[in-house]
Amino acid sequence: MLLARLAQVSREVAATSARSRKTVLLAELFREAEAADVPVVIPYLAGRLPQGRIGVGWKVLSRRVPPADAPTLTVRDVDARLTRLGAVSGAGSQAERTRLVGELMGAATEDEQRFLIGLLTGEVRQGALDAAAVEGLAAATDAPPADVRRAVMLAGSLQTVAEALLADGPGALDRFRLTVGQPVLPMLAHSASSVAEAVGKLGAAAVEEKLDGIRVQVHRDGGTVRIYTRTLDDITDRLPEVTEAALALPGERFILDGEAISLDADGRPRSFQETAGRVGSRTDVATAARAVPVSAVFFDVLSVDGRDLLDLPLTERHAELARLVPEPLRVRRTLVHGPEDTGAAEEFLARTLARGHEGVVVKGLDAAYSAGRRGASWLKVKPVHTLDLVVLAAEWGHGRRTGKLSNLHLGARTADGSFAMLGKTFKGMTDALLTWQTERLKELAVEEHGWGVTVRPELVVEIAYDGLQRSTRYPAGVTLRFARVVRYREDKRPEDADTVDTLLAAHPGVAP
């Protein structure tokens, strides 16, 4: 397949909001693709490189290269060139990358150059890999859409299913089954602003503790246990406690969904950072298990004794879970009948927060398990933390944000009145906010650098974040998890900003 064709479809998909039109465009593309093209076509449509990062920055891409007159590049040719680029290292690597990028761009037409620059800077975003892609693939291969959807769910990958369908036709779907030892992507939750909102949407529901641990999918086949993360990485050897817990259960063949969490001496959850350290690739497992022991807590069951339970309602899966897993290893939950029980749900949330957990997940009782999707029947509710911080510096953006000051350096007040940096963020900014922010920060600039500007610490910004973790990278000794801009607070002075001490007091146990 020519890159020009893929670039054209990507552009047309991005230009329409109609799912039906996206489906038609993607069906046409899949009909033209060969099975061998799929490992490149699918990631490129998603704006992702199969190679991951390849060390090519905006400075190299900004160099003007005369485009080719006619399209000749195939997607597989581009993939091979980018693989060579990613392998460049050592002395002279920057010059070699520049040369290889120049060769690639010189072989590309103007439209292809635009697509490649967007791909390499992360600016290809058209939401192609959603229901429209599944329906397009089904239409292209004369396969039932529901069967393709289920195969993608079980395979955890549209790419895997597309390769099979394009190579072998609809009969290939029979090979995609829920199987012990083959992980599936977990079901995820949407967010709700409150318990009342969640219960109002779902009606009869289970309200469960939301644990801030390591999401684990545990597979047991007789005496063999495998443990997978939410991204399907095998971490069996790093969590022997979870293996031991699974082997102690009465069932012989099952798949469980849950969390591995670590509690301190007072029975409160340790920080996510500490718990997540248990699965580091360089972790000494025995030493880590003594320092940060983990426990398995399960909240769902996907398969028992060869029976696929994904399509059963939550109430029936809960019953199966209770038969298999003893209460101490099951997540705490309460049941509500509808909005009239909102008070009980809010009380459960309050008790959950008091125990140190991060919130609750409200789950519709009649809902099936939608592997690999954010199901509308699971709604997570957790308090949103916000801070008033001061902008200390800002970095120039890349790609679509070129020429705009984008990545903010954030600081909190210290005891002596200075500001300690505790993180960066470029999230939560609209185009209008970026434009305003750039002009305002230019006015406050005291020093210019190649990467951006240092500014007078006068501008207060309200930041939302999901949690706090220790960090040796920043002077404050801690950093924010998933920080994003809510709004600027020009009504506040720098001395009104939150302090490092206040932040640490709000998150006991995370002090550096």
From Swiss-Prot:
Cofactor(s), by name: Mg(2+)
Recorded catalytic activity of this chain's protein: ATP + (deoxyribonucleotide)n-3'-hydroxyl + 5'-phospho-(deoxyribonucleotide)m = (deoxyribonucleotide)n+m + AMP + diphosphate
Pfam families listed in its UniProt record: DNA_ligase_A_C, DNA_ligase_A_M, DNA_ligase_A_N
Domain of life: Bacteria
MF terms (GO), sorted A to Z: ATP binding; DNA binding; DNA ligase (ATP) activity; metal ion binding
Gene Ontology BP terms: cell division; DNA biosynthetic process; DNA recombination; DNA repair; DNA replication
InterPro entries for this protein: ATP-dep_DNA_ligase, DNA_ligae_ATP-dep_bac/arc, DNA_ligase_ATP-dep, DNA_ligase_ATP-dep_C, DNA_ligase_ATP-dep_cent, DNA_ligase_ATP-dep_CS, DNA_ligase_ATP-dep_N, DNA_ligase_N_sf
Residue ranges the record marks as coiled coil: none
Keywords: ATP-binding, Cell cycle, Cell division, DNA damage, DNA recombination, DNA repair, DNA replication, Ligase, Magnesium, Metal-binding, Nucleotide-binding
TM helices/strands, residue ranges: none
Documented EC number(s): 6.5.1.1
Positions with a binding annotation for ATP: E208, R215, R230, E259, F299, R374, K380
Chain's role: DNA ligase that seals nicks in double-stranded DNA during DNA replication, DNA recombination and DNA repair.
Annotated family: Belongs to the ATP-dependent DNA ligase family.
Name of protein: Probable DNA ligase
Species annotation: Streptomyces coelicolor (strain ATCC BAA-471 / A3(2) / M145)
